[in-house]
From Swiss-Prot:
Residues bound to S-adenosyl-L-methionine: S35, G36, H37, D55, F84, D105, Q112
Protein name according to UniProt: Ribosomal RNA small subunit methyltransferase H
EC class of the enzyme, as a word: transferase
Gene from which this protein is expressed: rsmH
GO biological process, one term: rRNA base methylation
A GO CC term attached to the entry: cytoplasm
Length: 316
């Protein structure tokens, strides 16, 4: 891993081991990031196995080309710079219509958080950006300065689950009428000013939920995850597995719902048997989400909210 792209991988062994790797299999890392999961997965493949890695951040791919060089030299890795919502189309274009396993590590990678100018962090002063893909048109600046009041309230409440969404949106509306809100610090101060004093004494940064909401909106994170996970489940071969790491309740709820729909069947009462086309196509590998160990939590503070869910395809 290069110094410029330092990232501590969360739930490394659990995420990959639960995929039950076949040495000659075809696998996908939908969220390359710091390439930790990819490196561990590749170590389990034979030279006949192959890994396709997606990331919309060129820096992640540049870093992986250094850290995974030995596997690249053997022709075991293909990098795809794109949003994982286009996963099915991009794999199909490469002649891949079936995979043995796929993993997702959702959310923002450490290097993106730590790179001040990306504007993801409320702890560092930077221009309001928050784009995972630096070529994408919509920025956090656009959301904060151009979205109507009602739209701000909606995304703050829906994606940030912040009960002071209206007050924060009103404070933003008042401030931007005087001059544009340009930096993360300006925005964080406005959020603080909109909240009651007793709220500011609570654990955690008062701007955390609103920054999350804006980031999700800028990158359409939930829409992309929904599309991509459904496509991935279609692409999986029989006995293929999918591992998904989430970092907040919205992502976890989405993953849990998609897995539940595929692993349960809703049949009318009194039906003597379940028709073949109504039987579940997946089963849950673990009934409850897998959480980081105490050792991992002690070593990596960013692992605290991580949850891993795994499902296996049992019927085509």
């Amino acid at each position: 891993m290069t110094k410029e792209f330092h990232h501590v991988t969360v739930l490394l062994h659990e995420t990959v081991d639960m995929l039950d790797i076949k040495p000659n299999g075809i696998y996908v890392d939908a969220t390359l990031g710091g390439s930790g999961h990819s490196a561990y997965l590749l170590s389990k493949l034979s030279e006949q196995g192959h890994l396709y890695c997606f990331d919309q951040d060129q820096k992640a791919i540049d870093n992986a080309q250094v850290t995974l060089k030995s596997y690249i030299d053997k022709g075991q890795v293909t990098f795809i710079k794109d949003n994982f919502r286009h996963l099915k189309a991009r794999l199909t274009a490469l002649g891949v219509d079936e995979i043995d396993g796929i993993l997702y590590d959702l959310g923002v990678s450490s290097p993106q958080l730590d790179e001040r100018e990306r504007g993801f962090s409320y702890n560092q002063d930077a221009p309001l950006d928050m784009r995972m893909d630096r070529q994408a048109p919509l920025t956090a600046y656009d959301v904060v300065n151009t979205y109507p009041f009602n739209d701000l309230v909606k995304i703050f409440f829906k994606y940030g689950e912040d009960k002071f969404s209206k007050q924060i949106a009103r404070k933003i509306e008042q401030a931007r009428a005087i001059k544009p809100i340009e930096t993360t610090t300006e925005l964080a101060e406005l959020i603080k000013a909109a909240k009651p004093a007793k709220e500011l004494k609570k654990k955690g940064h008062p701007a955390k939920q609103i920054f999350q909401a804006i980031r999700i909106e800028v990158n359409d994170e939930l829409g992309a995850a929904d599309e991509s996970i459904q496509d991935a489940m279609e692409l999986l071969a029989l006995d293929g597995r999918i591992s998904v790491i989430t970092f907040h309740s919205l992502e976890d709820r989405l993953t849990k719902q998609l897995f539940k729909e595929a692993s349960t069947v809703d049949v009318p009462k009194g039906l003597p048997f379940i028709p073949e086309d109504m039987k579940p196509t997946f089963e849950l590998v673990s009934r409850k989400p897998i959480l980081p160990s105490q050792e991992e939590l002690a070593a990596n503070n960013r692992a605290h909210s991580a949850k891993l869910r795994v499902a296996k395809k049992i019927r085509k």
